[in-house]
A protein has these predicted regions:
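Extracytoplasmic cell-surface/polysaccharide-interacting catalytic and binding patches
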Residues: 4-32, 36-312
Length: 312
């Protein structure tokens, strides 16, 4: 070390200054390297002996952050996306309201209601179903193509006084629509609205209100006789079904292949949505920072619809 200092003090003043500058630079570099090495070693030890290191799923993280919860048992039997048939009976507990009592039921310019309810006053539907239907009927009546038509007739819905009805109508999600062909002559004649030009607007726009034509005549299950049955599923689901020209059952099959990190993504009149499926034995993953809705599928699984544009 003594020799080092002697070397630094030898030579002219200018030579000594240059030697000292080089020496200081070497010392500073060595100290910096030692500090960096220490930080690296400490970080490695923390990680090795219990330090937490989160590894978010990149695909999932690019869409929405998630967390987990435990769904209530009744949620698997409720919602707008239940499979309903003879093998999958309705077991839900959704509130059914009388259609006649809906406060937002639209009226014509002259005062009467835009549509008529079937022969019994006890036809009902879920709040979401009838609210969406009322908005659709108000817009239909106001559209130039309707000619201010007020002959629509809800021929069939959930009959709250009858136990002998199909699973579809018992759910309060389905409405069968007919119309008065000769309202002032014979009110008993009520054909299906299917195939009638002035009601084409309803078929073209129902998805914007959350409805699907339950049995399109073009599908395997379709028939002209049932082509006037509309089911409420919600705007994003109705939009996807309409755009992809598939049946409700085919949509449920498509959903079964989705996950929180690989959802269906769709842009609707109601905003951007992510939709994914959780199987019966799957972890209950939900968005952490976005609002969402849950529907059972009546097979034990759950369908989560995330509002991509709405944060909590």
């Amino acid at each position: 070390m003594k020799n080092v200092f002697l070397a630094l003090e030898s030579g002219s003043m200018e030579q000594q200054r240059k030697k000292k500058s080089v020496a200081y630079a070497i010392i500073i570099t060595a100290v910096a390297l030692m500090i960096s090495l220490s930080v690296f070693l400490i970080s490695g030890l923390v990680s090795l002996f219990g330090g937490k290191s989160e590894k978010p799923n990149k695909d999932n993280n690019s869409l929405f952050e998630t967390t987990t919860t435990v769904f209530e048992g009744s949620q698997k039997d409720n919602g707008s996306l239940l499979l309903l048939d003879d093998n999958h009976p309705y077991r839900g507990t959704s509130e059914i309201i009388l259609i006649r009592d809906a406060k937002d039921r639209p009226k014509t310019d002259g005062g009467p209601y835009v549509y008529t309810i079937g022969g019994t006053p006890y036809l009902g539907a879920t709040t979401e179903t009838i609210s969406a239907f009322n908005q659709m009927m108000a817009d239909f009546y106001a559209h130039p193509s309707s000619g201010k038509d007020d002959n629509i007739y809800i021929d069939k819905a959930c009959n709250i006084t009858s136990a002998s009805q199909s699973e579809l109508f018992a759910s309060g999600l389905c409405l069968a629509l007919t119309y008065y062909e000769n309202y002032n002559v014979d009110s008993s004649i009520r054909p299906s609205i299917y195939g009638v030009e002035k009601y084409k607007w309803i078929y073209d726009n129902a998805h914007k209100y959350g409805f699907i034509q339950l049995y399109p005549a073009t599908t395997e299950d379709g028939s002209t006789a049932d082509a006037n049955i509309f089911r409420y599923v919600g705007i994003p689901h109705a939009t996807y079904i309409k755009q992809n020209k598939i049946s409700f059952e085919e949509y449920l099959t498509a959903l079964s292949a989705t996950t929180p990190s690989n959802p269906i993504s769709i842009n609707t009149v109601d905003g951007n949505k992510y939709i994914y499926y959780i199987p019966a034995d799957g972890e209950h993953v939900i968005p952490k920072n976005n609002t969402y809705s849950i529907s059972g599928d009546n097979k034990g699984g759950y369908i989560i619809t995330v509002n991509a544009d709405v944060s909590i």
